[in-house]
Curated annotation (Swiss-Prot):
Part of the energy-coupling factor (ECF) transporter complex CbiMNOQ involved in cobalt import. It comes from the Archaea. GO terms for molecular function: cobalt ion transmembrane transporter activity. Keywords: Cell membrane, Cobalamin biosynthesis, Cobalt, Cobalt transport, Ion transport, Membrane, Transmembrane, Transmembrane helix, Transport. The lineage of its organism: Archaea, Methanobacteriati, Methanobacteriota, Methanomada group, Methanococci. Forms an energy-coupling factor (ECF) transporter complex composed of an ATP-binding protein (A component, CbiO), a transmembrane protein (T component, CbiQ) and 2 possible substrate-capture proteins (S components, CbiM and CbiN) of unknown stoichimetry. The chain crosses the membrane at residues 6-26, 68-88. It is a multi-pass membrane protein. Pathway: Cofactor biosynthesis; adenosylcobalamin biosynthesis. It comes from Methanococcus maripaludis (strain C6 / ATCC BAA-1332). Belongs to the CbiN family. One of its GO terms (biological process) is cobalamin biosynthetic process. The keyword Hydrolase does not apply. Its main location: membrane. This is Cobalt transport protein CbiN.
Length: 97
């Protein structure tokens, strides 16, 4: 395996493990990883308690786990599309050379 591939693999491992090590167990009870939607909703209610949303979602997932699953599925589909694009362009470039 080439040295640049080893460096890339090590970089991915470090980038994956660094947040897990840095934030292991910190802030879970305070909603540290709560998300932007919840924080924005809380801020809107703090600024204007009488605010009423313009519309409601037509379907809401029955649990947080299903919501996370749908989000992960959306991310996986996006990653597959991006990976296909890069693979297609690399194969096209290799065919020219």
């Amino acid at each position: 395996m080439e040295f640049k591939h080893v460096l890339m693999i090590l970089g991915v491992i470090i980038l994956t493990l660094a947040p897990l090590i840095m934030y292991s167990g910190l802030g879970e009870d305070e909603g540290y990883f709560g998300g932007a939607d919840g924080a924005a909703g809380d801020l809107i209610m703090e600024i204007s308690p009488n605010y009423e949303p313009w519309f409601e979602p037509f379907w809401e997932p029955p649990s947080g786990e299903i919501e996370s699953l749908l989000f992960a599925l959306q991310a996986a589909i996006g990653a597959m599309i991006i990976g296909y694009f890069f693979g297609y362009n690399k194969a096209k470039y290799d065919d020219k050379n």
